[in-house]
Amino acid sequence: MTESSGSTTIVLDFDGTITEVDLLDDLARRFGDSVVYQEVEDALLTGTITLRECITREYEPVTMPLDEAVGWVLANVRLRPGLRELVAFAKARRWSVRVLSSGFEEIIVPVLADAGVDGIDVLANRVDARSEGWRVIWRDEAVCAVCGEPCKRSGLPEGEVIYVGDGISDRCAALAARRVFATRGLARYLSERGLPHEPFDDFHDVIGALAP
């Protein structure tokens, strides 16, 4: 199926989608408190805390200076193949590309710049990297009428949305998209509910599926 031009946006999750490893998890596990990290991850999976509560508690023990964190990320991050090609593919069709993330703009923007990816919109949270513990500055406090929590759905643009994601933070937003490419936890979630989605391993798969 060919998408109509002019009002189509490819919306990309960042952690675990653009990156091969979930950096939000990796930073908290490596530079925070590993015991706290595991406790809140388990609580998130059982539904006893929200995603926001999880991220807040995981980053409270992180005291690493932000420039050191960015340096570590740039030295170690691996991006999913085909990102630049997907952005070029979208631009050639006059589609927009938006990164919509539960992570931190202060991490995402340097990663994209280092990878030579520019001219795309980034919608993410911010972080106040205090020496006594990182404090998350949430992008949007509005509660979603669908899932009952503040979520990524509020960050979706108008028009047709092609959503590409991998995890818990992508669930509600993906349900609002016209077309969904999913991997890992998001793919399992949608499959268990019989909801339509297309699997992908890298962004070349997405390009191949979208190309006329």
Regions found by a protein language model. Name each.
Residues 2-126, 130:
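Alpha-helical substrate-recognition element adjacent to the catalytic core
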Residues 82-96, 103-212:
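C-terminal cap/substrate-recognition subdomain and adjoining C-terminal extension
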